[in-house]
């Protein structure tokens, strides 16, 4: 299966992606992990990304797209994958479509993990990170709504909504059900 996970910060995408990857026997592909791997291994793309990250800038979409494109060529992704944190914009979604098209593939599912904003604020404040102030958290939601919400329309034909409030295993069961598993 080829799956994209969407949802705001604190919705549990990373945790659920890990559980789904384990259950389905396919890799979880996170852009954060891709950046760290390529930087620590000194790849050309990693060194390029490091320049932006060291300067505190966002890595350009073209570079992120190239990292994802390379990762999709890895043998473990041949049977499927779970994309966690990518795409973040319609532009990246279109780039992903092209990556899949050149491999004669398509997405099987797009899951949106939905949690009320007040619950997300509570979750994120509970993590105890210094930078997780309420203002910072609410700004992250605004950025998510502005940039990622259009993806919900873009993927409307394949989109399945998962209620991500509740115990980890309850949310996992809902995600599996949304995937028809």
Swiss-Prot record:
Stretch list, region LID: 126-132
Subcellular compartments: Cytoplasm
GO molecular-function terms, A-Z: adenylate kinase activity; ATP binding
Main location: cytoplasm
Listed EC numbers: 2.7.4.3
Any one GO CC term of the record: cytoplasm
Record CDD domains: ADK (cd01428)
Keywords from the UniProt entry: ATP-binding, Cytoplasm, Kinase, Nucleotide biosynthesis, Nucleotide-binding, Transferase
Catalysed reaction equations from the record: AMP + ATP = 2 ADP
BP GO terms, sorted: AMP salvage
Protein residues bound to AMP: 31, 36, 57-59, 85-88, 92, 129, 140
InterPro entries membership: Adenyl_kin_sub (IPR006259), Adenylat/UMP-CMP_kin (IPR000850), Adenylat_kinase_CS (IPR033690), P-loop_NTPase (IPR027417)
One Pfam entry name: ADK
Positions bound to ATP: 10-15, 127, 166
Family note: Belongs to the adenylate kinase family.
Domain remark from Swiss-Prot or TrEMBL: Consists of three domains, a large central CORE domain and two small peripheral domains, NMPbind and LID, which undergo movements during catalysis. The LID domain closes over the site of phosphoryl transfer upon ATP binding. Assembling and dissambling the active center during each catalytic cycle provides an effective means to prevent ATP hydrolysis.
Family matches, as HAMAP family: Adenylate_kinase_Adk
Protein purpose: Catalyzes the reversible transfer of the terminal phosphate group between ATP and AMP. Plays an important role in cellular energy homeostasis and in adenine nucleotide metabolism.
PANTHER family xref list: NUCLEOTIDE KINASE (PTHR23359)
Summary of subunit composition and partner proteins: Monomer.
Name recorded for this polypeptide: Adenylate kinase
Lineage, broadest ranks: Bacteria, Bacillati, Actinomycetota, Actinomycetes, Mycobacteriales
């Amino acid at each position: 299966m080829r799956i994209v996970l969407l949802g705001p910060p604190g919705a549990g995408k990373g945790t659920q992606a890990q559980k789904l990857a384990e259950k389905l026997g396919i890799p979880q592909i996170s852009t954060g992990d891709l950046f760290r791997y390529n930087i620590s291994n000194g790849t050309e793309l990693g060194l390029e990304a490091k320049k932006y990250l060291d300067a505190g800038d966002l890595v350009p979409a073209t570079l992120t797209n190239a990292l994802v494109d390379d990762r999709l060529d890895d043998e473990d992704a041949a049977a499927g994958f779970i994309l966690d944190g990518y795409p973040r914009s319609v532009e990246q979604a279109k780039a992903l479509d092209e990556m899949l098209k050149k491999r004669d593939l398509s997405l099987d599912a797009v899951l949106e993990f939905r949690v009320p904003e007040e619950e997300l604020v509570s979750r994120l404040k509970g993590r105890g990170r210094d930078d997780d102030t309420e203002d910072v958290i609410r700004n992250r939601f605004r950025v998510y709504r502005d940039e990622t919400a259009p993806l919900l329309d873009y993927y409307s034909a394949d989109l399945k909504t998962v209620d991500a409030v509740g115990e980890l295993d309850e949310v996992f069961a809902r995600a599996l059900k949304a995937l028809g598993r």
